[in-house]
């Protein structure tokens, strides 16, 4: 099989490495020439996955047309804000019958579309049925190291979900299939906002009780939004919902949790992301998820609080107080 991964960041490189490790011929594309040169010459990506050797069947190209030539599987692994321009550039070189796996997590700010909705907005209608989402508790570094991981692959066509599942399945990477694209996407992007809240809680020393409450109530508001968009609520109890949320809220590898800890220490989100050297999607998604919730009439108090901390200068401690002092209500 020939596969193309658009995006050579940590997640794109980890998935490209996984596919190449199965013996597939894989080409990574990116706009960062230095990263591509490192992959091509040294079979490494020291910027995003330092110290890890990449398979020799992983190649690199900075030309979209060349990278997609003969591709039987396309993985879209760019940051959420880059999905639309990259798909616009790539669409002439992708053909019907080729599965397109979107692993970007986000809600586009201007349109409030999920990533697959953005892709469908750009691609010709005959390509829409071949679109799939891969999401779940999966840090790139651990996947690249071959540590056991389970994820969800969602597609509207069961045949496409199964095809993508088979392409990615290894002895250390286990995909489950689903038909709930919306649920997987909403779970995958809004959990990053809740993870910022978890980082704030941890950074301010609020303890295990607060963390458990944040994860539980965070899942509740994620589920409300997903269901309003047509998702199956059970999806949010699975890998692409609860699984991804728990991982992102609890691990030091989480960039979004790191942002929250930095905010608790008095840093700005911009300064924290410069230190990280990578995108923390929850910063953008706090704004777009809030706007989507307002449009759909969904109550999302944690998302609202994080938005106010990031964009209105609300002190983290005041945000916690505001959440705790909301009008009392039944849990369910």
Swiss-Prot record:
NADPH binds at residues 10-11, 31, 105, 140, 255, 279, 281. Its main location: cytoplasm. One of its GO terms (molecular function) is glycerol-3-phosphate dehydrogenase [NAD(P)+] activity. It comes from the Bacteria. It is found in: Cytoplasm. Pathway: Membrane lipid metabolism; glycerophospholipid metabolism. Its EC number is 1.1.1.94. It catalyses: sn-glycerol 3-phosphate + NAD(+) = dihydroxyacetone phosphate + NADH + H(+); sn-glycerol 3-phosphate + NADP(+) = dihydroxyacetone phosphate + NADPH + H(+). The keyword S-adenosyl-L-methionine does not apply. Sn-glycerol 3-phosphate binds at residues 105, 136, 138, 191, 244, 254-256. Keywords: Cytoplasm, Lipid biosynthesis, Lipid metabolism, NAD, NADP, Nucleotide-binding, Oxidoreductase, Phospholipid biosynthesis, Phospholipid metabolism. The active site is at residue 191. Belongs to the NAD-dependent glycerol-3-phosphate dehydrogenase family. Catalyzes the reduction of the glycolytic intermediate dihydroxyacetone phosphate (DHAP) to sn-glycerol 3-phosphate (G3P), the key precursor for phospholipid synthesis. This is Glycerol-3-phosphate dehydrogenase [NAD(P)+].
